C-alpha cells in the first residue's frame, strides 16, 4: 500500500487531519441513517484493483437502503484554499472526505 492510501485510510477511519462533508441528500436523512452511513464509510476496507485502480483509497461506493453512496477524498493545502502540492505529505495537506448520494455526483 502506498503512503497516500495509508493516510487516506487513517483519515477515513478517524476523521483526523481534515474535514468531513455530508451533501444535502445525506444531510436530509435521519440521524440513524447518517450514523449508519458514516460507520460504513469509516469501516470500508474492500478496495480492489477494479474499484481502486490507482491504489490510493480515495473513492468508493457502498449500498445503503437501496441508495448508492459515494465517498470521495480530496487533498487541500492547510488553509483549504488550493489543491495540495503533495498529498503524501501530511505536514502540508488537509483531506476532505465528501459523503454523497451517487445522484449528487
Residue ranges and their predicted role:
Residues 2-62:
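Compact soluble domain cores
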Residues 59-105:
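Short, compact, well-ordered microdomains
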Amino acid at each position: 500500500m502506498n503512503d497516500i492510501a495509508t493516510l487516506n485510510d487513517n483519515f477515513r477511519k478517524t476523521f483526523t487531519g481534515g474535514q468531513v462533508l455530508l451533501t444535502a441528500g445525506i444531510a436530509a436523512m435521519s440521524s440513524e441513517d447518517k450514523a449508519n452511513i458514516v460507520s460504513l464509510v469509516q469501516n470500508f476496507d474492500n478496495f480492489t484493483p477494479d474499484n481502486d485502480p490507482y491504489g490510493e483509497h480515495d473513492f468508493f461506493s457502498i449500498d445503503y437502503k437501496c441508495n448508492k453512496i459515494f465517498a470521495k477524498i480530496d487533498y487541500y493545502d492547510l488553509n483549504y484554499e488550493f489543491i495540495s502540492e503533495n498529498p503524501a505529505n501530511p505536514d502540508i495537506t488537509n483531506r476532505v472526505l465528501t459523503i454523497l448520494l451517487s445522484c449528487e455526483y
